[in-house]
Amino acid sequence: MAAQTSIRRKLRARRKVRIAAGERPRLSVFRSSKHIYAQIIDDKNGTTLAAASSAVVKAGNKTDTAAAVGKALAEAASAKGVKQVVFDRGQYKYHGRVKALADAAREGGLDF
């Protein structure tokens, strides 16, 4: 039952991202039990514009580390000239580490 809910949530989120994407690159989030990874992907060209992960960035607990990853990603994106993205949370709820990463990316200058 939990797996079906997760799959439905993922498909619902992806559908919304596809509709909203248009001309904007996608900020994709992957969360494991130890780390969190985020990358900005240009789906038209199939290239990764910027990436950051907690394997490189460390800061206190998992939520603080996720916020540091969001800030690092925003800095890398602004260096490449990316200001607007579509947030792709995947199957993860917008809560905890995912929310901390998104909030820090917004504070860093990304618009979504």
From Swiss-Prot:
Annotated GO MF terms: 5S rRNA binding; structural constituent of ribosome
Name of the protein described by the UniProt record: Large ribosomal subunit protein uL18
Family of this protein: Belongs to the universal ribosomal protein uL18 family.
UniProt key word Ribonucleoprotein: yes
Record's function text: This is one of the proteins that bind and probably mediate the attachment of the 5S RNA into the large ribosomal subunit, where it forms part of the central protuberance.
Pfam families linked: Ribosomal_L18p
InterPro entries named in the record: Ribosomal_uL18_bac-type, Ribosomal_uL18_bac/euk
One of the GO biological process terms: translation
Position of the signal peptide: none
Cystine pairs: none
Subunit structure and binding partners: Part of the 50S ribosomal subunit; part of the 5S rRNA/L5/L18/L25 subcomplex. Contacts the 5S and 23S rRNAs.
CDD domains, per the entry: Ribosomal_L18_L5e
Gene3D superfamilies: 3.30.420.100
